């Protein structure tokens, strides 16, 4: 049996005999799913095509981290945990601690759309609950895990720089 996958203008036939779908996908380290949450199957479409970087824009709304590009598109059921973190954890458990079996670290670009400090404080607490899959930054030590979170958008630069332990890196800019 073969599955056709549309990737950047070409169709690739992937054999599925004797392998799970996740094992049959070749990780594409140069592929990024921008505004990934706009897909019918956020995260899953990107992973099924082998993407190693996905973007989720988040808004802090009533204490929840909701995924949407604009505030008026926020839906209470579209939490960061449900759309991204839980499925990533499931994949990592199924693939021996990686999103793709024996594959590279996957980047989750998290674009903070609401206030930097409040949104990051909420995100930091959530990421800590998923410490088993997220790369850990402790002083000068980096412990790579299945996923590296990369904070963009409204970035709490000083707050993150002053943390002893965190589970996210910072999207750098020229003034940094």
What are these model-predicted stretches?
Residues 22-28, 34-37, 42-55, 59-176:
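Catalytic cores of phosphodiester-bond hydrolases, prominently lipid phosphodiesterases
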């Amino acid at each position: 049996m073969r599955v056709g996958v549309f990737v950047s203008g070409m169709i690739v036939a992937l054999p599925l005999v004797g392998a799970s779908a996740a094992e049959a996908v070749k990780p594409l380290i140069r592929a990024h799913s921008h505004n990934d949450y706009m897909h019918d199957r956020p995260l899953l479409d990107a992973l099924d095509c082998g993407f190693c970087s996905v973007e989720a824009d988040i808004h802090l709304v009533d204490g929840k981290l909701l995924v949407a590009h604009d505030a008026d598109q926020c839906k209470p059921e579209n939490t960061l945990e449900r759309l991204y973190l839980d499925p990533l954890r499931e994949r990592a458990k199924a693939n021996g601690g990686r999103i793709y079996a024996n594959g590279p670290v996957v980047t989750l670009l998290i674009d903070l759309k609401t206030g930097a400090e409040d949104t990051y404080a909420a995100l930091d607490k959530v990421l800590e609950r998923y410490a088993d899959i997220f790369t850990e930054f402790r002083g000068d030590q980096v412990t790579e895990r299945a996923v590296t979170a990369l904070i963009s958008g409204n970035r709490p630069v000083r707050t993150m720089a002053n943390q002893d332990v965190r589970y996210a890196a910072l999207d750098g800019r020229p003034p940094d």
